[in-house]
Amino acid sequence: MTPTAAPLFLAADVGGTRARFLLARWRGPEADSPWEPLSRRVFADDDFPHFDAALDAFLAECPLGAEPKLAVIALAGPVTGRRARLTNRPWTIDADALSARYDWPRVELMNDFAAQAFGL
């Protein structure tokens, strides 16, 4: 798979005070690191009225033409179906709405504690 054809992946960790974003490219399991980070950013949640505004700010800083096809968002709050609401901030995140808005074929939401467990 050539680097230009390799899929891009957006990961986010959204808490009550900060939203962390990563855009990376898949390099394959043979590489020292299977993902090549392209852009990283941490934002203060207080600077944005809702999650989509923080996400828009991150995407605006990403390399031109960098369009992820997969997004996984871990957040501090319960996930019910394809929607989630942060426990300590009045933000609601809807996976289907994000998929439609950004034309992303796959958007997954998970509780941040569950995401931490997957990382162990």
Residue ranges, per PLM feature:
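Short, flexible, glycine/charge-rich loop motifs used to bind or transfer phosphoryl groups or to couple energy/partner
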Residues: M1, A31, E61-C62, A97
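Short glycine-rich, Thr/Ser-proximal phosphate-binding strand/loop in the N-terminal lobe
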Residues: T2-A57
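Short beta-strand-loop/turn "lid" adjacent to the catalytic site in phosphate-handling enzymes
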Residues: C62-L120
